[in-house]
Design a protein with these regions (language model features):
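Short, glycine-/aromatic-enriched active-site segment of Class I SAM-dependent methyltransferases
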Residues: 179-199, 226
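Short alpha-helix
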Residues: 202-217, 221
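Conserved class I S-adenosyl-L-methionine
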Residues: 2-74, 77-86
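Conserved beta-strand signature within the Rossmann-like core of class I S-adenosyl-L-methionine
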Residues: 170-181
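A short, conserved alpha-helix within the catalytic core of class I
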Residues: 153-168
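Conserved Class I S-adenosyl-L-methionine
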Residues: 219-297
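Class I SAM-dependent methyltransferase SAM/SAH-binding core
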Residues: 87-134
């Protein structure tokens, strides 16, 4: 952290229990047999297009995006950094209201969809084709008024990643992450032993992330968010999605998926949804007052 950051104290050595726990969970996940990293999965144009089309046909999608944008309170004309900005979910609306937006996105497939979305929206922004871990401070330029990382915390050394966010921001940092296991993770935990003869360790969750920040001397707000279930029209649709997601390659694995979803899907007003609920968290703090328990200013 920068020594001049208001409210942040360097006098006590930082403990690393939660930071190391995050690293261990990420390492366990990446070494799981059959696991495909998020970077690999989202560098597939078919996966990106499938998610993009599906999400934007859901009635709840735009409402969720609007709620997140409103919760961040980013003023018109602000200088904004969107880490792992994907197809422009937050970046394009912010650019449309006059913000100077920079998107860091390592996936070529995501950047391709982002460029298409920019062309149709008539807005412009800066795109840096890189991982957050590989970006230098000189590439980022002047400090940002807001930094966003929405479901893009794939980095194993979360402490270094958060340090860099704190250092390049003169306003607020906003992290969106899983508070409870998302539906796809619950499916993976249920099916990975049957498909790959291994346990699925899952992602570290928002409680771990908040504790990492606390260890670093950052008193962040955590606001829970309820997530709407993904709607499918047929069992075939969900089997196709998870056949790819769960690194399947055989007809036997497809039958395991079909049998599982036959019992786990239930009807809703719009189609079929997976049983169970998922919650996420919006974690945010003021970088100029990171060490103060009062983060309302």
């Amino acid at each position: 952290m920068k020594p001049q950051t208001k409210g942040f104290s360097q006098s006590k050595p930082q403990t690393r229990f939660w930071r190391d726990l995050w690293y261990q969970k990420k390492l366990a996940l990446s070494s799981t047999a059959g696991f495909e990293s998020s970077g690999t999965y989202w560098n597939n144009r078919k996966n990106v297009t499938g998610l993009y089309v599906k999400s934007r046909t859901r009635k709840s999608w735009q409402g969720n995006v609007d709620a997140q944008l409103n919760a961040m309170h980013i003023p018109d004309g602000a200088r904004v950094l969107d880490i792992g900005g994907g197809t422009g979910t937050h970046a394009i609306p912010l650019a449309a209201k006059g913000c100077d937006v920079t998107v860091i996105e390592p996936s070529g497939a995501m950047r391709e969809q982002l460029q298409e979305n920019l062309a149709s929206s008539g807005t412009g922004l800066t795109i840096l084709p890189s991982r957050w871990e590989d970006i230098s401070g000189s590439e980022l330029g002047d400090p940002f008024d807001a930094v966003i990382a929405s479901y893009s915390l794939s980095m194993s050394d979360i402490g270094d990643a958060l340090d860099k966010m704190q250092d390049c921001c003169q306003g607020t940092v906003h992290l969106f992450w899983f508070l409870s296991s998302p539906s796809w993770a619950r499916v993976s935990q249920d099916l990975w032993p049957l498909l790959h003869n291994r346990e699925y360790p899952g992602e570290p969750l928002a409680d771990c992330l908040w504790q990492v920040l606390y260890e670093m001397g950052i008193y962040a707000n955590l606001i829970p968010e309820c997530k709407k279930a993904t709607v499918y029209q047929t069992i075939d649709e969900v089997v196709r999605e998870y056949y790819q997601r769960l690194s399947c390659s055989t007809g036997q694995q497809e039958e395991i998926l079909r049998e599982y979803f036959s019992s786990e899907l239930m009807p809703s007003g719009e189609g079929l949804v997976l049983k169970g609920n998922s919650c996420s968290a919006h974690i945010w703090w003021n970088t100029w007052n990171a060490g103060s328990p009062d983060q309302t200013g």
